[in-house]
């Protein structure tokens, strides 16, 4: 039996797809490319934007056209918040939301016996238990480790709390065990991920995200630990101190901004203002001088005037990120922001382009500042005679080498920059 996956959206979705694939493989299934004929198709959907919804529907229909006799499973955030949309597509066999993924193989076998559509989408508001989806192998050299699910913030633009529910933390012993297993299998870098990653522990009585970091850096053989995303309010003095002293936690933090204007942040229901945000990052830089910051920015949020956008633009330059992830605001039905006055799409598009150009400028300037320095690089692939990988600062680096370097962590002296850093192994 052959199974094919198509995953849309975030790293959490990628993690969950890999976990489901492992379950199928353990049951004797062979993975094939989504473009090929398969017995089972799994589409892991995204609903962060309208584009995510439409792409999800497109991939579902593509699977049905490829093999009308296949078992087509639809899971994830889109099917969680709008299962009726998926039910309207003829040919879908199984519909799950953001729960019950650990039952997917059994549900496929049940469907193949009865050929009766299965819809298993539960209300996530009351969920308080973390669904353990364990993975012991990845296709890449770095391993992702999902430590929590859900979000309690309810930003006015965001549909995700309705798709994922409240914060639910994985049991500490489960996280530590999986981390040790991954290191034992040869992974030297682990990336902590979740819907609101550093919200880990908010639902636990006496164990915090800081406590988890302390336990993880003690794992023998773990060389690099990366936090996929963390809010300024979650960066405690304890965490700053730990990063400054640890050789394991990388000097790179992705700290979502969303807007660099207090008026916009207030409408978004973000839990900080620009001054608080800037002070926290400045405090980190004092203790960790080499740290770099990347961020997310939403452009064209309802009510965003030209003046507000300019404030965001200037604030971004003031902070000095190394990269921006720029998203045009996408109205999500049922969120408070959907009822606000919307920004013209043309204006939104122009502002997005300005910030993307700024991101390229910031990234190039920072990359060139690394020439002559030594970076620690984890090599992930071979390409056109070079080995390519990411530094601790998440910049891409390539080196020529006669020796096989994939999966290895090496010190590299940076010699030049040509859209990517170029260096040589020390």
Roles of regions detected by a PLM:
Residues 138-141, 151-153, 249, 259, ...:
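Short flexible coil/turn linkers enriched for glycine and charged/polar residues
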Residues 1-199, 214, 253, 275-286, ...:
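Proteins enriched for Cys/Gly/acidic motifs involved in redox and nucleic-acid/cofactor modification
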Residues 155, 175, 192, 227, ...:
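Conserved, mostly hydrophobic/aromatic
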Residues 16-17, 52-56, 205-209, 238-239, ...:
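Residues at alpha-helix caps and immediate loop-helix transition turns in enzyme cores, especially N-
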Residues 304, 320-321:
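Contiguous mid-protein beta-loop-alpha structural module that forms a pocket-lining wall or clamp
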Residues 339-426:
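Terminal RNA-binding accessory module
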Residues 72-73, 81-82, 86, 184-306:
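Conserved SAM/AdoMet-binding glycine-rich loop
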């Amino acid at each position: 039996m052959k199974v094919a996956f198509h995953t849309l959206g975030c790293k959490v979705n990628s993690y969950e797809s890999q976990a489901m694939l492992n379950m199928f493989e353990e049951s004797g299934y062979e993975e094939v490319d989504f473009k090929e004929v398969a017995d089972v198709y799994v589409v892991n959907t995204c609903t962060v934007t309208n584009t995510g919804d439409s792409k999800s529907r497109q991939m579902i229909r593509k699977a049905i056209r490829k093999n009308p006799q296949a078992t087509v499973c639809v899971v994830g955030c889109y099917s969680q918040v709008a299962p009726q949309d998926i039910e309207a597509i003829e040919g879908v066999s199984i519909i799950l939301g953001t729960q019950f993924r650990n039952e997917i193989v059994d549900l496929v076998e049940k469907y193949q016996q009865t050929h009766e559509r299965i819809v298993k989408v539960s209300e996530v508001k009351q969920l308080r238990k973390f669904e353990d989806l364990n993975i012991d192998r990845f296709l890449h050299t770095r391993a992702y480790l999902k430590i929590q699910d859900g979000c309690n913030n309810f930003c006015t633009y965001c549909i995700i709390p309705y798709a994922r529910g409240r914060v639910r933390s994985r049991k500490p012993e489960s996280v530590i065990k999986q981390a040790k297993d991954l290191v034992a299998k040869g992974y030297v870098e682990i990336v902590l991920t979740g819907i609101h990653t550093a919200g880990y522990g908010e639902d636990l009585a006496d164990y915090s995200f800081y406590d988890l970091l302390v336990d993880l850096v003690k794992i023998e053989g773990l060389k690099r630990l990366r936090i996929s995303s963390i809010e300024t309010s979650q960066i405690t003095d304890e965490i700053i101190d730990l990063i400054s002293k640890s050789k394991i936690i990388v000097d790179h933090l992705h700290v979502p901004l969303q807007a660099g204007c207090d008026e916009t942040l207030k409408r978004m229901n973000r839990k900080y203002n620009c001054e608080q945000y800037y002070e926290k990052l400045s405090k980190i830089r004092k203790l960790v001088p080499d740290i770099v910051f990347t961020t997310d920015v939403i452009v064209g949020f309802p009510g965003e005037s030209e003046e507000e956008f300019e404030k965001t633009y200037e604030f971004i330059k003031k902070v000095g990120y190394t990269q921006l992830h720029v998203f045009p605001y996408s109205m999500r039905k049922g969120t408070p922001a959907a009822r606000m006055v919307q920004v013209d799409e043309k204006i939104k598009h122009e502002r997005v382009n300005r910030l993307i150009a700024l991101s390229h400028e910031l990234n190039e300037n920072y990359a060139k500042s690394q020439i002559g320095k030594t970076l620690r690089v984890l090599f992930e692939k071979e390409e056109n005679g070079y080995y390519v990988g990411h530094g601790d600062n998440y910049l891409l680096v390539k080196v020529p080498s006669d020796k096989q370097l994939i999966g290895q962590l090496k010190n590299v002296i940076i010699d030049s920059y040509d859209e990517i850093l170029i260096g040589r192994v020390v």
